């Protein structure tokens, strides 16, 4: 016998409470507490059915992957889509998630995989107009406008065996009749996503869930969907910039940290197969305060431009700002430069930016940042065709970094023949300038 209970849940963070309150005690948000019905069962073991165990034998075949016509997507996924997998694609509203998903299911992919595009945000006519604008109109892709979970499951059951891939755009618009809370709340998102993922795994179909992120970059509040799915992808970019980056943050069938680069155009998303060349295109030489960093994103080497600007300040605490880089790490590099080579910027405002709207999390970018700061402070350009990579310790030493050969190969391919890196890399080529300390960098750049 089941017993119906009620509790109160925060629509922002998912925290539950037995009583209503005006403010969530966990996240502090006001007016976010809503009532939710909970069905509990005290005799779960009695109503359950016995399941047979299986042994983890060596007779296991590799997962069959389905290659898509979007090579950058395949790179991020680890080689293609896996049957029975659940994939979550998050990103800001309007960043291009729907465009990417429509290009996937309505392109040449639809001729070999039976696809269903379910929209909860747009009407069918809007989807058709967007497909017409992107030149994706075909008679192979099925589309459905639905907001109710039960209707979606019933439609999938009625077409069982005729669907290989399902797109839900977006999960925030789907609701179940079992809950009284409105669509988009934590309980609705969690319940609907759980049911859809379970259905996909039981029927060995691929499901892609589109999900908006909140202001602080979280998926539907407390990232409550990430543990439900096999793969989590984030679509990153700036609305004022035409570059888009698809990055993997979780992948049970491939590597984490892989990126795919796209360019947004009037005809949709265009793959960028050589992002280093694109990000450095039409770049002027001998620009003061700029340095090229040879980075690694996942398994892909990528050259990025680091820009620094230093201006005098009358403020007691001059401003330090960083776009695309950790501002706390910038403060650390400034402290090391001041302590180890006497570059005191205490009375200057410091601004750092990564060109192209990219974000760098690698410690190996320390050396490029330091070089750009020295160039901006001394008002001298860096040597032409130079590339930097290396981690800087608090003592000012330049540490060894991973995948140095791949970084150097990418730099040489694009015409950069002056590689400045750590001496501990043990590389003796003529085009490599090995340094052990920031003092060596200062001498190499000819700063006084």
Curated annotation (Swiss-Prot):
Keywords: ATP-binding, DNA damage, DNA repair, DNA-binding, Hydrolase, Metal-binding, Nucleotide-binding, Stress response, Zinc, Zinc-finger. A zinc finger (C4-type) spans 10-27. Its EC number is 3.6.4.-. GO terms for molecular function: ATP binding; ATP hydrolysis activity; ATP-dependent DNA damage sensor activity; damaged DNA binding; zinc ion binding. The keyword Hydrolase applies. GO terms for cellular component: cytosol. Gene3D superfamilies: 3.30.230.10, P-loop containing nucleotide triphosphate hydrolases. Belongs to the RecA family. RadA subfamily. Has a putative N-terminal zinc-finger, a middle region with homology to RecA with ATPase motifs including the RadA KNRFG motif, while the C-terminus is homologous to Lon protease. This is DNA repair protein RadA. It comes from Rickettsia bellii (strain RML369-C). The gene is radA.
């Amino acid at each position: 016998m089941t017993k119906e209970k009620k509790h109160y849940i925060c629509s922002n963070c998912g925290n539950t409470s037995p009583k209503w309150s005006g403010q969530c005690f966990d996240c502090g948000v006001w007016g976010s507490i809503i009532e939710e019905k909970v069905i509990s069962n005290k005799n779960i073991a009695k109503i359950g059915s016995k399941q047979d165990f299986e042994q983890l034998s060596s007779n296991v075949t590799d997962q069959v992957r389905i290659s898509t016509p979007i090579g950058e997507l395949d790179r991020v996924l680890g080689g293609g889509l896996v049957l029975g997998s659940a994939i979550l694609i998050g990103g800001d509203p309007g960043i291009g998630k729907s465009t990417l998903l429509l290009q996937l299911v309505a392109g040449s992919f639809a001729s070999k995989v039976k696809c269903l595009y379910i929209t909860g945000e747009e009407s069918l006519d809007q989807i058709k107009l967007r497909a017409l604008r992107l030149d994706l109109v075909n008679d192979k892709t099925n589309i459905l406008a639905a907001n109710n979970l039960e209707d979606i499951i019933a439609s999938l059951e009625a077409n069982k065996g005729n669907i290989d891939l399902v797109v839900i755009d977006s999960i925030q618009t789907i609701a179940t009749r079992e809950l009284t809370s409105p669509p988009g709340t934590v309980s609705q998102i969690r319940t609907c996503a759980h049911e859809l993922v379970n259905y996909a795994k039981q029927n060995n179909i691929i499901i892609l869930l589109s999900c908006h992120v909140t202001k602080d970059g979280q998926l539907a509040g407390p990232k409550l969907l990430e543990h439900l799915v096999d793969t989590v992808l984030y679509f990153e970019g700036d609305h004022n910039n035409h570059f888009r980056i698809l990055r993997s943050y979780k992948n049970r069938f491939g590597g984490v940290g892989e990126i795919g680069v796209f360019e947004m155009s009037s005809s949709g998303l265009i793959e960028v197969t050589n992002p280093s060349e694109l990000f450095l295109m039409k770049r002027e030489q001998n620009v003061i305060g700029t340095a090229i960093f040879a980075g690694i994103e996942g398994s892909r080497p990528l050259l990025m431009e680091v820009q620094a600007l230093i201006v005098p300040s009358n403020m007691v605490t001059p401003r330090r700002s960083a776009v695309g880089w950790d501002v706390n790490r910038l403060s650390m590099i400034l402290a090391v430069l001041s302590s180890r080579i006497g570059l005191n910027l205490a009375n200057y405002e410091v601004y750092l930016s990564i060109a192209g709207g990219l974000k760098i999390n690698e410690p190996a970018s320390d050396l490029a940042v330091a070089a750009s700061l020295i160039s901006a402070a001394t008002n001298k350009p860096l040597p032409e065709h130079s590339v930097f990579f290396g981690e800087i310790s608090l003592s000012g030493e330049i540490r060894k970094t991973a995948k140095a050969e791949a970084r150097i190969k990418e730099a040489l391919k694009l015409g950069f023949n002056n590689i400045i890196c750590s001496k501990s890399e043990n590389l003796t080529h003529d085009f490599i300038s090995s340094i052990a300390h920031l003092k060596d960098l200062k001498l190499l750049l000819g700063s006084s």
